[in-house]
């Protein structure tokens, strides 16, 4: 189906959090004292290609627990398989053109404040599947222009924005040749089950946001997605 620019929705009653019965965040579940064994985003691990060839014996599938302390640029096809990724505040992951970034059963989260999220360059691809969870992002996934997205069985929790399509600003000098495409968008959950980091009652702003673009989203026969307060 085709999704067009967002329309105003009636405001719902903000959720009331019970501090004594809040579910555990990914940080509480998976963040041990001290450092994770792998530190990405440093000078020698700034690019996915550095990780693949210098740390991972040429394999583009990485498994392990990661502290992402600086920006990670996905400059060649790269998969995080069953990884726990603890991300420093204000850090982002950027996927370059003509590259595929896959999250397969991985958990991405921030323990203080918020991380920026995953930025998709023109003609890039992101695949998320197998109970991947993305938490604590300003915008968990953002595609200002042409990108391909396959999102299945993924939980977006406690993000300010879950997925943003299009460009929130003046129309670019070069318009996008095609609009963002979801090849799959099924079985996902969007929720905010505890206050946003750094707040006592802050909640997600929007789950899927569309600006000044059209977007093709899945098929009518796809499994349902769940949107919760």
Name each model feature, range by range.
Residues 15-18, 35, 127, 150, ...:
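Intrinsic disorder/low-complexity signature
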């Amino acid at each position: 189906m085709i999704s067009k620019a967002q329309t105003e929705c009636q405001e719902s009653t903000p959720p009331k959090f019970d501090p004594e019965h809040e579910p555990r965040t990914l940080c509480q579940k998976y963040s041990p004292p001290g450092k994770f064994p792998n530190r990405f985003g440093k000078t020698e691990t700034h690019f996915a290609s550095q990780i693949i060839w210098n740390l991972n014996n040429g394999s583009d599938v990485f498994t392990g627990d990661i502290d992402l302390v600086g920006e990670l640029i996905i400059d060649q096809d790269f998969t995080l398989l069953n990884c726990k990724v603890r991300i420093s505040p204000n850090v982002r992951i950027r996927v370059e053109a003509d590259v595929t970034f896959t999250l397969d059963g991985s958990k991405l989260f921030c323990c203080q404040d918020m991380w920026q999220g995953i930025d998709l360059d023109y003609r890039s691809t992101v695949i998320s599947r197998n109970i991947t969870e993305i938490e604590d992002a300003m915008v968990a996934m953002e595609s200002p222009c042409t990108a391909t997205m396959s999102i299945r069985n993924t939980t977006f929790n406690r993000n300010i924005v879950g997925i943003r399509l299009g460009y929130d600003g003046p129309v670019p000098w070069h318009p996008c040749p095609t609009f963002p495409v979801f090849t799959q968008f099924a079985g996902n959950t969007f929720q905010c089950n505890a206050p946003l980091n750094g707040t006592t009652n802050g909640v997600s702003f929007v789950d899927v946001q569309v600006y000044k673009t059209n977007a093709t989203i899945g098929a009518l026969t796809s499994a349902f997605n769940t949107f919760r307060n």
